[in-house]
Amino acid sequence: MKRLGIFFFYEKNGDVDDFITYYLADLNKNLTELVVVCNGKLSAQGRAAFEQFTDNIIVRENKGLDVWAYKTALDSYGWAKLTEFDEIVMTNSTLMGPVRPLKEMFDAMWENQDLDFWGLSIHHGAKSNPFKGKHLYNYLPVHIQSHFIVYRQRFVKAPELQNYWDNMPMIESYTDSVQRYE
């Protein structure tokens, strides 16, 4: 099993709290490789916290929210390298836990080989779209929430997914993020 983790982080001062290192300590046990993408500042304390788990730390302008942080990591690897992984986990610093070892979840989900992608939680959608401004739909579809999404290798190899990420427009707001990514 070869699994890449992409961890998105934002905190206005760039400081990493203990709940994040607690999460990463367990997550990292299930990864072959980890890249951390920080939008904005990363303090010396924050860098030291992440360096416990990886030297692959990208600090970038705070632009494009989580979507463009993930895109930055994907672009840094390129599709040829990304397709070498059995799974790619995209997650962020809005999760707390785990309460139980993540290995249990990863093992259970790996048994279901019919999945091209999966996530930790879903939003159940709405008949009308609660977001103002740009809309792709007049309703809010049921969707996997962006704080934890896993892509399987065959999905990463799909030209449709590669095209989706290669042509992802700049994300300007939370609404854009939900509408175009989740």
Model-predicted segments: where are they?
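Short acidic, S/G/P-rich loop/turn micro-motifs used as interaction or catalytic elements
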Residues: 10-15, 41-42, 95-98, 125, ...
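Catalytic core and acceptor-binding pocket of nucleotide-sugar-dependent glycosyltransferases
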Residues: 117-121, 138-182
